[in-house]
Structures are given as C-alpha cells and as structure tokens.
Amino acid sequence: MIPVRCFTCGKVISTAWEEFKQRRDAGEDPGAILDDLGLTQYCCRRMLLTHKEIIDELNPYQ
C-alpha cells in the first residue's frame, strides 16, 4: 500500500503509483518515468523509488 501523500511535503503521490509501477516493470528508466509524471521534488521521488509492497507478506498474520 503506497502512502497517499508524501511524508515530507504532503503532495498527493498515490495517483502516480500504478502508472509508475507498470512502466517500471516494462523496463523504462525510473527517473524518466518520474519526470514524465511531474514528480520533480526529491522527497516525492524517494517515496515511489523506495516503496516495497509487503501487504501480501503480512496478509497471513491477520
């Protein structure tokens, strides 16, 4: 689950997650994808670049 907003500046970033993930999985350069999505601030970029989906790993413990 990607956070809805950037922890530092508060910009909404969750709307860019699905497109970023699809394009990254297709082999595009992550930096170029973030530029195309309009995420130019370092804080917002790191939110998407460093995110790891762990929800599937946590589901058995619910």
UniProtKB/Swiss-Prot annotation:
GO BP terms: DNA-templated transcription
Binding, Zn(2+): C6, C9, C43, C44
Domain of life assignment: Archaea
Entries under SUPFAM superfamilies matching the protein: RNA polymerase subunit RPB10 (SSF46924)
Keyword Transferase: yes
Record's catalysed reaction(s): RNA(n) + a ribonucleoside 5'-triphosphate = RNA(n+1) + diphosphate
Entry note: cofactor: Binds 1 zinc ion.
GO cellular component: cytoplasm; DNA-directed RNA polymerase complex
Enzyme Commission identifier(s): 2.7.7.6
Localization: Cytoplasm
Keywords on record: Cytoplasm, DNA-directed RNA polymerase, Metal-binding, Nucleotidyltransferase, Transcription, Transferase, Zinc
UniProt family annotation: Belongs to the archaeal Rpo10/eukaryotic RPB10 RNA polymerase subunit family.
Gene Ontology molecular-function annotations: DNA binding; DNA-directed RNA polymerase activity; zinc ion binding
Summary of the function given for this chain in its UniProt record: DNA-dependent RNA polymerase (RNAP) catalyzes the transcription of DNA into RNA using the four ribonucleoside triphosphates as substrates.
Keyword Glycoprotein included in the entry's annotation: no
Pfam families assigned to the protein according to its UniProt record, in alphabetical order: RNA_pol_N
PANTHER family: DNA-DIRECTED RNA POLYMERASES I, II, AND III SUBUNIT RPABC5 (PTHR23431:SF3), DNA-DIRECTED RNA POLYMERASES I, II, AND III SUBUNIT RPABC5 FAMILY MEMBER (PTHR23431)
Root EC class: transferase
Name this polypeptide is given: DNA-directed RNA polymerase subunit Rpo10
Coiled-coil stretches noted in the UniProt entry, renumbered to this chain: none
Cofactor: Zn(2+)
Subunit structure: Part of the RNA polymerase complex.
